[in-house]
Structures are given as structure tokens and as C-alpha cells.
Regions:
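Structure-specific DNA junction-binding interface
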Residues: 1-105
């Protein structure tokens, strides 16, 4: 896989065959090339990768169904990835709080 475009789903086997750093680099290159201003390109790319990883795994039906629903409701695939990533970011933030438990909701 030589390029990433969030408008097109990566082929799962090709995506998962990449090293995590390669995935982050591909996503970062897309955003730099598209001249999308971001406060933290690395964090943004990492959340894109986390969502794409879930979409590529066969057992992550809920994530795939959610992404498809968001697209049916009118979001672009890129914006739908952002929507899923925003939920993930909130959960990560919650888990980083003192006393948080990974088993909470």
C-alpha cells in the first residue's frame, strides 16, 4: 500500500500487513498533501489509524455498522471516520483520568 485516502476504504489485509508507524505515516502524508490544517498531525493520524484498524478487523462489526450508518446519513467517509474517532478520543480521555477503570461503561 503506497497511499491512503480516507474516502476509500483500504483493503483490510493490505492495511493490517503494514507496520503501525507506516499506517500513521500514510495518513499523515494524505493530510499534509491535502493541506488540511491540524493542531497535532501525529495525534490526528493515530486516531485515523485506530479507526481504520477497527474497520479492517473482521470482529469489529459495530464499528463498521456505525461508519456505514454515518455515511448513509450524509457524512463523507472521512468525516465518518472523524465522528468515530471523536468517540474513541473521549473514551481515551476518560481512561486517562485518575481512578478510571477500563471496565467502566
Amino acid at each position: 500500500m503506497e497511499r491512503y485516502d480516507p474516502a476509500d476504504a483500504p483493503i483490510p489485509d493490505e492495511w493490517l500487513a503494514l507496520d503501525e508507524g507506516e499506517r500513521i505515516d500514510l495518513v499523515g502524508r494524505f493530510h499534509r498533501g491535502a493541506r488540511i490544517p491540524l493542531p497535532n498531525l501525529l495525534a490526528h493520524a493515530a486516531f485515523h489509524v485506530a479507526v481504520e484498524n477497527q474497520l479492517a478487523l473482521p470482529d469489529q462489526v459495530l464499528v463498521r455498522d456505525t461508519l456505514q450508518r454515518l455515511i448513509r446519513e450524509g457524512l463523507s467517509r472521512h468525516d465518518a471516520i472523524h465522528a468515530v474517532a471523536s468517540v474513541l478520543a473521549v473514551r481515551v480521555h476518560e481512561l486517562l483520568q485518575p481512578g478510571a477503570s477500563a471496565t467502566e461503561s
